[in-house]
Amino acid sequence: MEIEGTLQDDRPASPKRADDLFDYDFGLDELWQETPNMPNNGAPMQSSARDESGLGLGLDEEVKVTKKRQPVAKLDESRLLSQPGIPKLRRTAKKKLRFKGKGHEFSDAARLLNFYQLWLDDLFPRAKFADGLAIIERLGHSKRLQAMRKEWIDEEKPKVTSENHNDALQASESSGSRSDDPVVAFDGLNMADTKRSRGDIAGDHTSDAEGMHIEDTLISSRQRGLDEGLFMTEDDDAAQQPDNRGAPDDDELDALLKEQELLLMNNASA
């Protein structure tokens, strides 16, 4: 059966069958109308729209291209006061910057300039070292940086604790009480007098032993007077105190002395 099928297929087609194959009713005009009008160079359909927008003058539509520009970094107050700015400079200077001192001034200055140059290069690489220093100097005159500089200076000052403050107050009060005490003031005057007397004695070419002896005698006499005043009885104190109620004035005493002198002179003449 398969052989018969192949034999039937291998048979030549009849003329009627060939006419049926090529006899199809399909219009080529309809096919060309359905397909879009594509140009020969393969340009898209937008070319017609461009021609219409250009009003047939051959001008293409202007295409506006806007580029997003990146913000340019500037060395301003905010950048200088940020963490990579002056705070980093203060923090690293305490840890890394060390000076040798006397005899190494040139090397210390070079080390300081190198330290500043590395810091400024990390902060603002666009500017040179001299230009960056000029910008920082100009920014240093602003009120914001002046206030921050004052705050940094106050932070570096030694802080006064409450205990130290109380000790200072007690010391000032004790010094004031000593100056107000009449006994202490009197002793200070006496010591000044004794020192002055010792200086005078030294000027008179006396020995130090004599000066010490005079000072001891002055101190002993003053102490003896104080002891006698302290241990004096009430009767002696009352006897030494004059009666102010019956005491004459100074003018009356002068008059009495003059009268006494006149009487003596008269008696002598007689």
UniProtKB/Swiss-Prot annotation:
It is found in: Nucleus. Residues 8-20, 156-166 have a biased composition (Basic and acidic residues). One of its GO terms (biological process) is replication fork processing. GO terms for cellular component: replication fork protection complex. Pfam families: Swi3 (PF07962). It comes from the Eukaryota. Residues 34-48, 167-177 have a biased composition (Polar residues). Belongs to the CSM3 family. Component of the fork protection complex (FPC) consisting of tof1 and csm3. Forms a fork protection complex (FPC) with tof1 and which is required for chromosome segregation during meiosis and DNA damage repair. FPC coordinates leading and lagging strand synthesis and moves with the replication fork. FPC stabilizes replication forks in a configuration that is recognized by replication checkpoint sensors. This is Chromosome segregation in meiosis protein 3. It comes from Neosartorya fischeri (strain ATCC 1020 / DSM 3700 / CBS 544.65 / FGSC A1164 / JCM 1740 / NRRL 181 / WB 181). The lineage of its organism: Eukaryota, Fungi, Dikarya, Ascomycota, Pezizomycotina. The gene is csm3.
